[in-house]
Each structure stands twice: as structure tokens, then as C-alpha cells.
């Protein structure tokens, strides 16, 4: 009896349960990357494995609206809503970047009910490294 031919691109060959397994995570790390154009919020466990993430672009904001504080607040709320359902109570916050969404994202994180152990600014600062881009002339 001949074996059935498996299609390589079929979904039957993939593992289905490993994608959305619900782990109980009591403590995590919330990374906020706020640039002038977008804000990305990533929630990881203490070992650095990504649990949930969201950005202003995935929340439906396009163009210059992605860099606004309201877009950052919405992105932070979406990322945290998923991990609160998984049982996260405590978190550390690491904020990176000069964008407008820094404070708005932190405000949304505080309002979510997660206890914050500390808030750390991890923006990379050069010790006179590369030459910055030239000034804009509008």
C-alpha cells in the first residue's frame, strides 16, 4: 500500500499546541522601545522569552500617527492585556528611545494593575561614537 504524499506547505505537519500554550508567569519584563516614528512594547519572562508584543502599527495606526502618545498608550495596553490573563502580577520596565510614547506607555502600564519593581532607562548613549546625521533644514 502506497504512503500518502505529504505536501510540504500544509498546516498538518506543523505543531499546533506549542504556539498558544498558556504558561503561568508571575514576574516579567516589559520592554518599551519608543522612536519618533513608532512605539514597540514587548513583554518577556525573566529569561527573555517573548510572551506578548504590540506596536502602534499593529494597533491600526498608520503614518505619522504611529509616533503619537495615544498610539503608544494603545500599544502598551494591548501587550499587557494578554499577559495579565496569563497571571502576571509583577514586572520590571525597561524604556529605550527618545520618542513621544515613553511617558504614555509607562502611564498605561501603571494603570494596568501590574506591580512595577523598577523602571529603568536603557537608551543607548554613545561615548562619542558615530557621527550623527546632519540637521534638517525645512
Curated annotation (Swiss-Prot):
It comes from the Eukaryota. GO terms for molecular function: rRNA binding; structural constituent of ribosome. Residues 9-23 have a biased composition (Basic residues). Residues 1-23 are annotated as: Disordered. Pfam families: Ribosomal_S11. Keywords: Chloroplast, Plastid, Ribonucleoprotein, Ribosomal protein, RNA-binding, rRNA-binding. GO terms for cellular component: chloroplast; ribonucleoprotein complex; ribosome. Its main location: plastid. One of its GO terms (biological process) is translation. InterPro entries: Ribosomal_uS11, Ribosomal_uS11_bac-type, Ribosomal_uS11_CS, Ribosomal_uS11_sf. It is found in: Plastid, Chloroplast. Belongs to the universal ribosomal protein uS11 family. PANTHER family: 40S RIBOSOMAL PROTEIN S14/30S RIBOSOMAL PROTEIN S11. Part of the 30S ribosomal subunit. NCBIfam families: PRK05309.1, uS11_bact. This is Small ribosomal subunit protein uS11c. It comes from Nasturtium officinale.
Amino acid at each position: 500500500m502506497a504512503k500518502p504524499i505529504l505536501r510540504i506547505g500544509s498546516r498538518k505537519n506543523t505543531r499546533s499546541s506549542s504556539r498558544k500554550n498558556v504558561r503561568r508567569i508571575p514576574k516579567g519584563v516589559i520592554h518599551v522601545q519608543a522612536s519618533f516614528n513608532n512605539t514597540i512594547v514587548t513583554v518577556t519572562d525573566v529569561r527573555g522569552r517573548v510572551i506578548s508584543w504590540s506596536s502602534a502599527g499593529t494597533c491600526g495606526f498608520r503614518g505619522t500617527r504611529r509616533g503619537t502618545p495615544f498610539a503608544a498608550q494603545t500599544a502598551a495596553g494591548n501587550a499587557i492585556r494578554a499577559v495579565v490573563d496569563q497571571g502576571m502580577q509583577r514586572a520590571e520596565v525597561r524604556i529605550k528611545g527618545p520618542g513621544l510614547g515613553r511617558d504614555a506607555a509607562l502611564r498605561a502600564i501603571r494603570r494596568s494593575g501590574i506591580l512595577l519593581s523598577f523602571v529603568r532607562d536603557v537608551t543607548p548613549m554613545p561615548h562619542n561614537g558615530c557621527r550623527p546625521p546632519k540637521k534638517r533644514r525645512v
